[in-house]
A protein has these predicted regions:
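Nucleotide-sugar-dependent
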Residues: 3, 50-57, 62-84, 93-102
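Short acidic active-site motifs
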Residues: 52-53, 118, 122
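N-terminal strand-loop element at the rim of the active site
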Residues: 174-179, 197-220
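A charged, aromatic-enriched C-terminal amphipathic alpha-helix characteristic of glycosyltransferases
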Residues: 131-162
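Conserved acidic donor-binding segment of nucleotide-sugar-dependent glycosyltransferases
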Residues: 106-117, 125-131
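Conserved catalytic-core segment of nucleotide-activated headgroup transferases in glycan assembly
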Residues: 1-59, 184-190, 195
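Short, polar loop motifs at secondary-structure junctions
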Residues: 27-34, 96-99, 204-207
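Flexible glycine-rich beta->alpha loop in the catalytic core of nucleotide-sugar glycosyltransferases
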Residues: 30, 70-71, 91, 98-99, ...
Length: 220
């Protein structure tokens, strides 16, 4: 995610300089960009946070940042960062592309930014306007609670799976280099094998013919 953060470093520099009470929290295994070290007193680096503790951490901030550089890979990412923040009533400012652009209603239940100018303008607005910030977060929570939790959709999902169930399944992955998203896909592949399915993996690059994980062996 370093490229994603570096994309908005010029914006963060201006905001931290203009708003001395502003604090930036960076969670995850990332290095602080050199350009931001001047504002080290306003920046907290937290490192890896256990997933069970992450909602509480997101709830502790006023604005959740989700910048994404415009790449094919990022356009295929989900809107999970918006969902995670919405469920704890924290407003999200995200790049206007991919699933964010499809899911988030700009100014209604989140904030979408196309370029550096919009990032600067909209983040300063959220910093200055607490009522607007809380209203957007509240609407995001309401919509996410209705549309994005399994309590309302689990039955429909199960019915769809039963209708389309196939004991032979294929997963198409960009590569076999392990990342968060690929790891999740492989865990689902293991679940399907345990349920009796035959699973094959397809990759867009690489020469591996088999993938081995514990007791599981997948043809690639």
């Amino acid at each position: 995610h370093l490229d994603d953060i570096e994309m908005i470093v010029p914006v963060l520099k201006q905001l931290l300089g203009k708003n001395p009470n502003l604090e930036l929290l960076i969670v995850g295994i990332l290095e602080l960009p050199v350009e931001l070290k001047l504002f080290a007193s306003q920046i907290q680096m937290e490192g890896f946070v256990d997933y069970q503790k992450l909602p509480e951490r997101i709830a502790s901030v006023d604005i959740n940042l989700a910048p994404l550089t415009d790449t094919i890979f990022n356009r295929a990412k989900s809107e999970n960062k918006w969902v995670e923040a919405a469920l704890v009533q924290t407003v999200t400012a995200a790049s206007n592309l991919g699933a964010f652009a499809e899911m988030v209603q700009d100014g209604e239940d989140g904030v979408l930014c196309r370029d550096e100018a919009e990032w600067l303008e909209k983040l300063q607005w959220l910093i200055d306007d607490e009522p607007a910030r809380k209203a957007i977060a509240g609407r995001a929570y309401g919509r996410c609670s209705r549309e994005c939790v399994t309590i309302f959709h689990a039955t429909g999902i199960c019915e769809w799976v039963e209708r389309h169930w196939n004991l032979r399944c294929a997963f198409v992955l960009p590569a076999m280099e392990i990342s968060g998203g690929i790891r999740v896909a492989l865990l689902h592949a293991e679940m399907l094998v345990k349920a009796g399915a035959q699973v094959s993996l397809f990759t867009l690059e690489g020469e591996a013919e088999w993938y081995h994980e514990g007791d599981f062996h997948f043809p690639v």
